Design a protein with these regions (language model features):
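Charged, flexible cofactor/metal-binding loops and thiol motifs
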Residues: 97-186
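A short, proline-enriched helix->beta-strand linker immediately N-terminal to the Walker B motif
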Residues: 29-33
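Conserved ABC ATPase "signature" region
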Residues: 1-5, 114-115
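P-loop NTP-binding/switch modules centered on Walker-like glycine-rich loops
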Residues: 36-40, 44-126
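Interfacial catalytic loop of ABC nucleotide-binding domains
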Residues: 5-10, 96, 129
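Conserved ABC ATPase signature
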Residues: 10-14, 18
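ABC-type ATPase nucleotide-binding domains, specifically the catalytic core motifs of the NBD
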Residues: 1, 13, 96, 142
């Protein structure tokens, strides 16, 4: 609680949550209109994660600043964001209102990210969908300029069409777009 003592402390003398708060305070010192939070809760326990998100939400309301949240944590996205832009290998693959994208993901990578999130059930006896992972590995940097779908090697729906050209974004109702020739409801 003693801010003056914390300002003189070394990072190794602080917890992960304290270091994160110092970084947020440093970023906000110049009153930015946009705050870019890149994986702001990585390696923090869930209680501290919730505190950081509460802090960011409070700061957003008080300052009016926009927050760009860069994360793989779809739970964080659901809590913090109004819109989501899902990227894969440096390319936008899906975009839209958060509730809509999480409820009806159109791109296979987005579906994979959402399937990785554990589902909470009321009773331990209730069936829970098994956790899944997105198979394969991210392409090497040499593939990033390729005129094809970079997710195709990891995609269960991939066809020859995916390797033929980079998919153009397709529009869906409600302002949702997905760059996939097989884009559709989950």
């Amino acid at each position: 609680p003693n801010a003056r003592a914390r300002a003189a402390a070394y990072p190794f003398q602080m917890s992960g949550g304290q270091r994160q708060r110092v970084m947020i305070a440093t970023a906000l010192a110049c009153a930015p209109k946009i705050l870019i939070a890149d994986e702001p809760t990585t390696a923090l326990d869930v209680t501290v994660q919730a505190q950081i998100f509460d802090l960011l939400n409070d700061l957003r309301r008080q300052s009016g600043a926009a927050i760009i949240l860069i994360t793989h944590d779809m739970g964080a996205v659901a809590e913090m964001a109004e819109r989501i832009l899902v990227m894969y290998a440096g390319r936008k693959v899906e975009e839209g209102p958060v509730d809509q994208v999480i409820e009806t993901p159109r791109h296979p990578y987005t579906r994979g990210l959402i399937a990785c999130v554990p589902h909470i059930v009321a009773e331990m006896s209730e069936d829970r969908p098994p956790l899944t992972e997105v198979p394969g590995i991210v392409p090497g940097l040499d593939a990033f300029g390729a005129d094809r779908c970079l997710f195709a090697p990891r995609c269960g729906s991939a066809t020859a069409e995916c390797a033929a050209a980079r998919p153009a974004p397709r529009a869906f109702p409600g302002g949702q777009t997905a760059a996939c020739v097989h884009a559709g409801p989950a």
